[in-house]
A protein has these predicted regions:
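Short, well-ordered alpha-helices that flank and scaffold nucleotide-derived cofactor binding pockets
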Residues: 59, 88, 92, 141, ...
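Short amphipathic alpha-helix with an adjacent loop that forms part of the alpha/beta core around
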Residues: 67-68, 113-118, 185
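Short, glycine/charge-rich flexible loops or terminal/linker lids adjacent to PRPP-binding catalytic cores
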Residues: 81-124, 131-137
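PRPP-dependent phosphoribosyltransferase catalytic core
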Residues: 2-14, 140-204
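Active-site-facing substrate-recognition patch
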Residues: 1-65, 203-204
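A general structural motif
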Residues: 71-73, 120-122, 150
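Short glycine-rich phosphate-binding loop at a beta-alpha junction
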Residues: 66-80
């Protein structure tokens, strides 16, 4: 099983080749500047790379006995639309019985209407990137509101300063990445990663 988990170098190679990892000058929605940006859906648009990443993440869950013993009677949950492809890929790799995803509606993260009419299996929360951990924490909250246990958490990539512990559950990832953010353009231009790249405003 371990051989099916791609090393971080292989994961980064996939992200670079598919355009999911980009270098340049990016302004994030919070106004901060960075030299790097991930657009993970570009890696999941291709079957082969999506399969490698999904199987790799799924193996991290299978290697944990407390999770493995509950498969396939588990639900794979994405905190948002961005992680839906990850959720379906991991669901297929684990042969999990259920897949769900949350959405932001009226400023609040929640499931679609009537989801609580059906019994949800123990949950594994997956996403494309763990940036601040906020979406994962909010998803844990709404899952627990349904009386469902969260047994696993994982993402394809995580920022180095992102939280890895959520209520005692270790968040797994295939790649950890050091992204330096700068409050102003002047600060960014003074960094080692600055370039002459044209400014791009990114959106999530």
């Amino acid at each position: 099983m371990v051989d099916l988990v791609p090393p971080p170098e292989a994961v980064m190679d996939i992200l670079v080749k598919t355009g999911a990892y980009r270098r340049g000058h990016f302004i994030y929605p919070n106004g901060k500047h960075a030299s790097h940006y991930f657009q993970m859906p570009l890696a999941f648009r291709l079957y082969d790379t999506a399969r490698i990443l999904s199987v790799g993440l799924s193996r991290l869950f299978r290697m944990e006995k407390s999770i493995a013993k509950q498969i396939p009677k588990v639900s794979i949950i994405s905190p948002s639309h961005a992680g839906i492809m990850v959720a379906f890929g991991v669901r297929e790799a684990l042969s999990a019985e259920q897949t769900y995803w949350a959405e932001i509606e009226d400023g609040k993260r929640q499931f679609r209407q009537y989801i609580d009419d059906y019994e949800m299996n123990p949950a594994i929360i997956v996403d494309d990137i763990n940036r601040s951990g906020r979406s994962i924490r909010e998803t844990i909250s709404i899952v627990k509101e349904l009386g469902v246990e969260v047994i696993g958490i994982g993402t394809i990539a995580k920022f180095d300063d992102a939280p890895t512990d959520f209520d005692g559950i270790e968040a797994k990832s295939l790649l950890s990445f050091d992204v330096n953010f700068y409050d102003t353009e002047d600060e960014w231009r003074g960094s080692r990663s600055a370039s002459d790249a044209e400014v791009e405003t990114v959106r999530f």
